[in-house]
Amino acid sequence: MKHTLLSRFAIVMAVALYAAPALVLAQDIQHCSNATSAGRWGFTTNGVLILPTGAVPVTAVGHFVQDLHGNMEGSQVRSVGGGVAHETFTGTVTTNPDCTAKYTISVYDDSGNLVRISVLDAVFTNGGRKARVVFESVTLPDGTSLPSVLSIDGDKQ
């Protein structure tokens, strides 16, 4: 009897230990949508623009609000090579079930003139409260493409 009870206990423990990693993995799988990424965000941008004259450092800090339909608007203060500007922006985002996303953002100067259009690739982590982003493209209003190495670190507020 004692031997049978110990054998059963050992089998139950072995099954539990074998199944535990699968249960943890199942809990880690996230299914994201625009609802996951909706909310108020704060962010910093860092990197370089690659101009014909060479690489120029870029940094920015800003915030935006994104709705459940993937629309967003916000503002930032950015420095490109030491030249500071206040900018506003509007855009759209499509958030995928695997928690990746693509943003298309139109950026405007203080007078409301279009300055550039940026396409960004993002991944949401920490239950949709953290975003890591890389710029896919930066295009000026005349169609000129600016090569860049820019990233954004964002936090849902």
Model-based region annotation:
Residues 23-157:
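Mature soluble binding/inhibitory domains
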